[in-house]
Structure formats: C-alpha cells, structure tokens
Amino acid sequence: NMLNAVGAELKDINREIGFKYGDDRDKPQPARARTTHDKLINLFKSSIPLRESEHAREYFQNRGIYGLPGYMVRFIPQLEYWNKKELIGKRDAIISCATNALGRPAYMHITYIEDGKKADLGDMPSRKMHSLSPNGVRPRCSIKFANQAPEILAVAEGMESALSYQEIYKTPTEATLNAGLLEEYRPPEYVKELHIAYDNDKKWAGQSAANKLKHAVACRCPWVQKIVMRGSLETGTDFNDVLLDGLGVETSDWIR
C-alpha cells in the first residue's frame, strides 16, 4: 500500500527532524550541535509554520502564491547571515528541507527575506543550500509540500516555480532546488502520471535537465504511464513568471 509507504517515510522524517507535522506542541528542544548536520537539524527544529508568520505569508503572496506550503517549508525570524566567518546581520528566512527516497533529510535550503521579497545583500546570495549528506554525496531528493501520495505528481526546480505550477494546474508538485537535482529525480512508485515543469533557461540548463529526466523515467520507471512536459514560451522565465504575468506555456505528452 503506497499510502502506508508514505506514512513510513513520514516517521523517518519525524524521527530525524524531531517534530510531528501539524503539531508543534510535541516538538523537542534542539540538542547540543556537534556537527554542521546537527546545527542544520536544530535550526529546522527552531522554525515555525509559515501560517504563523505575516512576513512569510507576504513573501509568497507577492509571488501570487496563496496556498502556503506546509510540511517541509517553514519560517525562522531574524536568522543570522554569515559570509564565511563574518556576521553580516540578521534577516527573516524561509527554510525548507529536501528529503531523499527514504525520507531522510538531504539538503536544507534557506531564503533570506525582507519587506516581502528576497533580502538585498549586495553581492552576497539571498539563498543558501546546505548538504546534509556525508562525503559530499548528492542524493536524489525533493521538497515535499504536503503529506500525500498522488497518482498525478509534478516536479519543478525552484520552490516558487513548483508552488506556482501547483497554483496554476492544481496538481501536487515537488521542488528539486536546481537543474542538476531535477535531472536525477525519480518519481515514487505510486505515481502514474508525471508532470515535468521546466525553467526556460537562456543557457538551456532547465530544458536539458527536463529532457534527461523524461528519458530516464521512460526507460527506468515502468510504473509511470504518462509524462507531461511543460515550460514557459518566454526565454529566461519559470512558472512563477507564468503565474504572475500570464505567459504562454509549451506542452508535450509522452504516453507509454
């Protein structure tokens, strides 16, 4: 039973992260951190649901996203921003956790925000991505926005692009964080129809990753009966641009 399988994954995530989704009352206090992995896990433990933060709601609503993601996307008020060993200051932050096929945390992704948009940090990035895997291994993983096992599932690169696709097409969507991880993504066995929502990149990174994913799923995931490819018609855009600006979308289907 695939729903039972998802439930087992949730137990693994809860055991590792340390709280029950939807019930912060039972959230344990962060333990003493001995490694970067521990520090990141503790950071996630200190976060709060997005619905409890006006700043988080404003950030997503400014992007046309009103269905707030739950589960593995949360909020941290006034998180320290470090540039190497220098403390630059504090900013509110959206923290998300990408998990692998076994439900284990693989990456923590942090977006620093200010005044309803990404924080302006000069030439320093407003986003940071931290691996939780040993020895630099890059596992197949994604950010899950809800506890469900849908037969029709979409996958996109960035979090905002994935949530925008979900908003437009009312299809449960996951985010892989970048093109490299999109290429390596594999859908769970309960998925019968996979939508690949790719970025229309100037240098073709998003399109290339999407095509490689389509080929891999067609060859190695016999449980997937249909693949739907969708991308913005305008170069240099993603599905958040489609949502906000009503851009046209190119669609192609593959059926087994």
Q: Which residues are covered by each model-predicted region?
A:
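A broad structural signal for alpha-helix termini and local helix breaks/kinks
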Residues: 6, 64-65, 169, 221
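Phosphate-handling DNA/RNA-contact segment within nucleic-acid enzymes
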Residues: 82-190
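Non-catalytic accessory segments of DNA primases and related replication-initiation nucleases
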Residues: 1-63, 225
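TOPRIM fold recognition
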Residues: 150-151, 159, 163-256
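Short, basic/aromatic recognition patches
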Residues: 66-89
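Short, small/acidic-rich helices and loops at N termini and domain boundaries
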Residues: 1-8, 75-78, 241-254
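Short clusters of hydrophobic/aromatic residues that line enzyme substrate/ligand-binding pockets
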Residues: 73, 143, 239
